[in-house]
């Protein structure tokens, strides 16, 4: 988690998308008058609805145990993703707007695929909070 200097006085509420210039960072989870905590995308407690850009297959992505990658189980009703496919938010969960960059598929196993986020979570200086319509 990270702390940001924006809160209720800035019209920030829980479950707002947080992004930087590289893509999705996470979502607000604990908002006070002037500060908020952000649950990072890489946290194992984080999950987001995503789609691949190439074939628009939909899935649920969560933080992997390594704290770096994101992992998703295959959805048997969707097309198989490929290594190198770009992943964006689907917008279906109504927390994140659609088409925010998330990352790139770097590994596929029998049951899962792994995504390397575009955001460098060790170097987050500035973020923006995105309001969902």
Predicted feature residues:
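A secondary-structure micro-motif
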Residues: 1-133
């Amino acid at each position: 988690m990270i702390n940001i200097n924006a809160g209720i006085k800035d019209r920030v509420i829980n479950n707002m998308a947080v992004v930087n210039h590289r893509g999705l960072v996470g979502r607000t989870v604990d908002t006070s008058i002037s500060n908020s905590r952000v649950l990072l995308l890489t946290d194992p407690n984080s999950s987001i609805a995503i789609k691949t850009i190439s074939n628009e297959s939909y899935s649920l992505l969560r933080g992997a145990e390594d704290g770096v990658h994101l992992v998703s189980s295959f959805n048997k009703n969707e097309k198989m993703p490929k290594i190198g496919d770009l992943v964006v938010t689907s917008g279906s969960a109504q927390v994140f707007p659609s088409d925010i960059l998330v990352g790139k598929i770097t590994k596929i196993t029998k049951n899962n695929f792994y995504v390397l986020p575009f955001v460098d979570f060790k170097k987050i200086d500035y973020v923006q909070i995105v309001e969902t319509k």
